[in-house]
């Protein structure tokens, strides 16, 4: 991908007062690390700008109707000058090159273009080339521009060498930054309390260390799964500990609204009640509906009484912010750009600013070249096939410059979505007042709903009496709640003798159902009058809506209706669920079940019948009480 406005040597610009030459500075260095290893660090432009420029920036949305590829106007200081500029979206090809063009509105420059190219070398290393082009407003400013350009490029070279040493020799990170002091007394208190609550010791140490000595940039948006992933810890345990930490005044919980395309946060609120049914991403120029499992993410920040952190922005557009985007480029109005297809065979998405999309199937047997045309809010064709590293030419037939990007669809996200968080028992216990706006049901694209029902309760109440029966029913709720929590789900509510629970993944829901049957069999052995009861379970997965009902988070929709109907198809000791889900189970999971029957049932409002399996535990459990009675009789 070429660098915008790039050329060889110097370029001339005619001004009303003088002839001004642009200043071009380049530097090439050799690195021992491979381009793919250097890329995630060298493209962290927020941190590199922090080190090289040293002054933060203020980002404001560009004026509506501006015929520009830029989405923001930036105000900052550099080299002793105040300046503002329109920042075009960064352009890049993964692991190969990136660049950015800034059209200056004020300050000593007309324009600023910066780019980095990473080329693999025969020894497995990288040839890194840095190129900076500065266009002064007046010829007298050219020497200053040259001086500043040399300084910036030299500093970037040193940062790249530090990155290389960090990767190759485990040298300190080049991004070590000064930190504000933490309140050690509050930290020690919170650590002791977290230990008392039985939370994972490694997770507790990681949280305390991060709050004590982590840079502000890492603390203004603490993402539990990302923190855990980087330290080899369990993500749910990290999330669980941070929820506990909120109750101890160690951190505060925030909800970030995340764009479904660039996946960056464009707004942040402190309560679920502040979330509406729609948000807008300025960068992607995209309005989108709020879905709890895609567009709302839980993040944390140290409580101000523990540590004061500042949210300074030095750059918001570098490739590091959107690792799922493999190519991004600006296509001027009425022109075309040729993009390189990804090297890995998979399905990708072509996205154009404003929301037009097309699918890209990268496969060895696909054509070498393909074309796409952008008209209004549509990309045609909607289905594109390309071989790895093939050429895709995109034509912009609109009246304004737009950026396009190729996105990985299967990129694993490290977001602790609101759907994940609200299914956790800790959230329901500690944050029962953090509810959605009553008039705003929010969609969840995929959720597995489990219903259980206690059987034999009529005989139980008759024989044991109301008090003993009520106690047994309540105790069985505790048993199921513990198992559901351990399996990654959350109890939504109890209704009479029944439990309703929600899970993120359908297979996890099946595993929880199996574990519930095992746990209940032990409960029948241990509990007085337990032998009078049984349990049956049904589950179903699909889209649903999350609402606030009876001052609690609840679920409704056809998926919930289907799950309830499926549970009614079960007999005592059975788990009933979809046939397709049964076939997706691993051999290990299937071995835990015995298939009783394949059945079909209809649900009102669902066009086709549900194809279900009735299953039992693979090994029938004989209660200890039955064994004792058999021994006594003999």
Across the structure, where does each feature detected by a protein language model lie?
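Regulatory cytosolic signal-relay segments
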Residues: 388-445
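Cys/His-rich short segments
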Residues: 244-315
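Catalytic NTP-binding/metal-coordinating core of nucleotidyl cyclase/transferase enzymes
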Residues: 434, 438-518
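A conserved amphipathic terminal alpha-helix motif
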Residues: 13, 133-177
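Catalytic beta-strand-to-alpha-helix segment of the class III nucleotidyl cyclase homology domain
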Residues: 501-622
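N-terminal accessory interaction module
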Residues: 307-412
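Hydrophobic ligand-binding cavity/cleft-lining segments
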Residues: 13-65
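Beta-strand/loop substructures that line and gate deep hydrophobic ligand-binding cavities in soluble
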Residues: 101-154
């Amino acid at each position: 991908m070429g660098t915008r406005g790039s050329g060889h040597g110097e370029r001339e610009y005619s001004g009303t007062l003088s002839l001004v030459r642009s200043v071009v500075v380049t530097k090439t260095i050799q690195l021992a690390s491979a381009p793919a290893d250097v890329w995630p660090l060298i493209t962290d432009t927020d941190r590199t700008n922090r080190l090289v420029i040293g002054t933060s920036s203020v980002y404001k949305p560009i004026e509506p109707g501006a015929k520009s590829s830029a989405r923001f106007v930036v105000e900052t200081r550099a080299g002793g000058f105040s300046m503002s500029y329109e920042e075009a979206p960064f352009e890049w090809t993964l692991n190969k090159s990136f660049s950015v063009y800034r059209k200056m509105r004020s300050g000593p420059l007309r324009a600023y273009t910066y780019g980095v190219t990473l080329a693999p070398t025969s020894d497995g290393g990288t040839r890194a080339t840095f190129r900076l082009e500065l266009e002064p407003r007046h010829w007298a400013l050219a020497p200053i521009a040259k001086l500043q350009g040399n300084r910036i490029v030299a500093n970037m070279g040193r940062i790249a060498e530090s990155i290389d040493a960090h990767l190759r020799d485990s040298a300190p990170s080049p991004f070590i930054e000064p930190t504000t002091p933490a309140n050690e007394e509050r930290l020690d208190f919170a650590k002791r309390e977290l230990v008392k609550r039985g939370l994972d010791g490694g997770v507790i140490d990681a949280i305390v260390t991060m709050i004590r000595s982590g840079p502000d940039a890492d603390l203004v948006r603490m993402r539990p799964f990302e923190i855990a992933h980087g330290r080899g810890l369990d993500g749910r345990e990290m999330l669980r500990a941070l929820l506990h930490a909120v109750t101890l005044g160690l951190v505060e919980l925030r909800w970030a609204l995340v764009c479904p395309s660039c996946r960056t946060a464009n707004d942040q609120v402190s309560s679920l009640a502040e979330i509406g049914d729609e948000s807008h991403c300025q960068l992607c120029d995209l309005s989108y509906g709020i879905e709890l499992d895609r567009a709302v993410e839980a993040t944390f920040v140290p409580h101000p009484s523990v540590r004061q952190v500042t949210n300074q922005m030095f750059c918001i557009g570098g490739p590091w912010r959107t690792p799922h985007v493999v190519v991004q480029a600006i296509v001027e109005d009425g022109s075309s750009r040729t993009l390189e297809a990804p090297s890995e065979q998979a399905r990708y998405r072509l996205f154009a600013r404003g929301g037009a999309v097309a699918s890209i199937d990268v496969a060895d047997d696909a054509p070498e070249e393909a074309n796409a045309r952008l008209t209004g809010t549509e990309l045609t064709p909607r289905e594109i096939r390309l071989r790895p590293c093939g050429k895709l030419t995109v034509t912009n037939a609109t009246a304004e410059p737009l950026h396009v990007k190729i996105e990985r669809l299967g990129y694993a996200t490290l977001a602790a979505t609101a759907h994940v968080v609200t299914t956790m028992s800790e959230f329901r216990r500690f944050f029962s007042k953090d509810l959605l706006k009553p008039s705003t049901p929010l969609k969840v694209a995929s959720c597995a709903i489990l219903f259980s029902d206690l059987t034999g309760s009529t005989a139980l109440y008759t024989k044991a009496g109301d008090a003993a029966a009520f106690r047994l029913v309540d105790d069985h709720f505790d048993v199921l709640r513990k198992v559901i929590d351990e399996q990654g789900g959350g109890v939504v509510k109890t209704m009479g003798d029944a439990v309703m629970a929600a899970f993120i993944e359908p297979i996890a829901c099946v595993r929880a159902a199996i574990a519930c049957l095992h746990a209940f069999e032990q409960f029948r052995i241990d509990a007085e009058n337990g032998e009078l009861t049984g349990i049956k379970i049904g589950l179903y997965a699909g889209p649903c809506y999350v609402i606030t009902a009876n001052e609690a988070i609840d679920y409704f929709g056809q998926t919930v209706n289907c799950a309830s109907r499926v549970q009614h198809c079960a007999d005592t000791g059975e788990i009933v669920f979809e046939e397709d889900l049964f076939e997706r189970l691993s051999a290990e999971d299937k071995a835990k079940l015995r298939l009783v029957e394949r059945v079909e049932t209809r649900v009102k409002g669902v066009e086709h019948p549900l194809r279900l399996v009735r299953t039992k535990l693979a090994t029938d459990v004989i209660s200890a009480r039955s064994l004792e009675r058999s021994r006594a009789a003999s």
